[in-house]
UniProtKB/Swiss-Prot annotation:
The gene is Plac9. Belongs to the PLAC9 family. Residues 1-19 form the signal peptide. Pfam families: PLAC9. Highly expressed in placenta, and weakly in ovary, testis, and lung. It comes from Mus musculus. This is Placenta-specific protein 9.
Length: 108
């Protein structure tokens, strides 16, 4: 999929440079054929493809960082809830010390 996107980005850059999508004059077929790459592998080095690949790498790194952060926060919240439940269960019950509702289920 990435190779296809790079190829499309390269074609878009080639067409924009030769006036296909821009406002410049259209080139003759012979000149356009001479300027176009001879194989699809040549498109992999185009600036648009390089930029796309760099952005994709940065997005992958950001996604991995977010996933690790979420996993860490889930573990922290689970640990804190466990501590709160343990504290709530260890409080003495009696007429002057009602069991507090630490999780907020009092129907406020």
């Amino acid at each position: 999929m990435q190779a296809l996107l790079c190829a499309l980005a390269g074609l878009a850059l080639l067409r924009a440079g030769t006036g296909e999508w821009g406002q410049g004059p259209r080139d003759t077929p012979g000149r356009r054929a001479a300027e176009s790459p001879s194989s699809p592998g040549d498109l992999a080095g185009s600036p648009g493809c390089d930029r796309h690949a760099a952005v994709q790498r940065r997005l992958d790194i950001m996604e991995e960082t977010v996933e690790k952060t979420v996993e860490h926060l889930e573990a922290e919240v689970t640990g804190l809830l466990g501590l709160l439940e343990e504290l709530a269960s260890n409080l003495p019950t009696g007429p002057f010390s009602p069991k507090p509702d630490l999780l907020g289920d009092d129907g406020f």
